[in-house]
């Protein structure tokens, strides 16, 4: 795997799977959200682990764990079994003196605390997991098209990269449908919807 380091926002199977365990070198620097995830990765043989804080670093890159996200609706988290399954999933802000500030929202729905994170950090580039995955009867567990528009209205100068579509079977929003929505709302200059494996450079 050609990466200097890895950030694991959480350890659901669609983010951290058997392929990751097998392909990533056990001494690769890996940043995780909490002690629980660190313990899991340690049990899988990884030993160069950092639990992210509000101010972690990797070389000249400042890594800030955000706390505003929630991997589902309040209704879903009111059910203890479902809350345990959804768990915690963080966002991350990356800053470097010579690069644009990047905010990776992670698996979260749109909520006031996410808006507060965006206003606080003022990122130049925002990566949104925008497949609009749902738990039946409990609503979305990640963002959808309206949420992407909310981000654009809040930070109109930011570039938005929409990912995590067509990734798992409970994602309701396809790349094609999101592209049509973006065009209908005339925000195409602000939004990238990359294909799997595509690199986006700003």
Predicted regions and their residues:
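Active-site metal-binding motif and surrounding structural segment of the metallo-beta-lactamase
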Residues: 1-33, 37, 48, 122-127
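Short active-site oxyanion
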Residues: 24-30, 100-102, 190
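Structural motif
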Residues: 4-5, 100-102, 125, 159
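Conserved phosphate-coordination/catalytic loops
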Residues: 10, 15, 83-86, 108, ...
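Cap/insert and terminal regions of metallo-dependent hydrolase folds
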Residues: 39, 109-196
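Helix-loop-beta element that forms the nucleotide-linked donor phosphate-binding surface
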Residues: 40-51
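Core dinuclear metal-dependent hydrolase active-site scaffold
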Residues: 1, 52-120, 196-202
């Amino acid at each position: 795997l050609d990466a200097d380091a890895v950030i694991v926002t959480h350890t659901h199977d669609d983010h951290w799977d058997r392929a990751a365990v097998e392909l990533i070198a056990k001494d690769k620097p890996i940043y995780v959200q909490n002690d629980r995830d660190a313990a899991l990765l340690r049990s899988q043989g990884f030993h160069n682990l950092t639990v992210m804080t509000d101010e972690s670093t990797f070389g000249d890159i400042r890594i800030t764990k955000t706390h505003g996200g929630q991997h589902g609706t309040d209704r879903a988290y009111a059910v203890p079994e479902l809350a345990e399954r959804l768990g915690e999933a963080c966002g991350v802000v990356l800053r470097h003196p010579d690069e644009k500030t990047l905010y990776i929202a992670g698996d979260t729905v749109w909520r006031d605390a996410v808006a507060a994170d965006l206003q606080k950090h003022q990122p130049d580039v925002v990566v949104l997991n925008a497949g609009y995955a749902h738990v039946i009867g409990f609503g979305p567990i990640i963002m959808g098209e309206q949420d992407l528009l909310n981000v654009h209205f809040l930070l109109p100068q930011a570039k938005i990269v929409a990912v995590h579509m067509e990734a798992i079977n409970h994602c309701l929003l396809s790349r094609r449908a999101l592209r049509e929505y973006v065009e209908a709302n005339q925000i195409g200059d602000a939004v990238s919807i990359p294909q799997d494996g595509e690199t986006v450079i700003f």
